[in-house]
Amino acid sequence: NHHLNNNIEYSDDKENCLNESLEYNHQIKLNKQNQNSFRNRTAFTDYQLICLEREFSHIQYLSRIDRIHLAQNLNLTEKQVKIWFQNRRVRWRKRNLF
């Protein structure tokens, strides 16, 4: 009887260990997915920033066509240009409120 109980306990411990291991592996996968979902911050060159600022000084809202052309000229994605303009408008508004 005692031997049987030991096997059951051992079996439970083994199962718990397996479950914990599976949970741990699942958490590692989730952490890797979360890390991969965040993009690296774009480091704009001085030239790109000068061109973006110059364009912003003329117009704060680019049409899609203008955004595509600017992105191509600066070797950026359309999304990078769009986000830069969004962020720049926020800074512009903050500075002009005070």
Curated annotation (Swiss-Prot):
Primary location group: nucleus
GO cellular component, one term: nucleus
Alphabetized InterPro entries for the sequence: HD, HD_metazoa, Homeobox_CS, Homeobox_TF, Homeodomain-like_sf
GO molecular function: DNA binding; DNA-binding transcription factor activity, RNA polymerase II-specific
CDD domains linked to this entry: homeodomain
Disulfide feature: none
Record keywords, A-Z: DNA-binding, Homeobox, Nucleus
Any coiled-coil regions, as ranges: none
One Pfam family, short name: Homeodomain
Location within or outside the cell: Nucleus
Keyword DNA-binding: yes
DNA-binding region of this protein: 37-96
PANTHER family, sorted: HOMEO BOX HB9 LIKE A-RELATED, VENT HOMEOBOX
Name of the protein: Homeobox protein SMOX-4
Gene that specifies this protein: SMOX-4
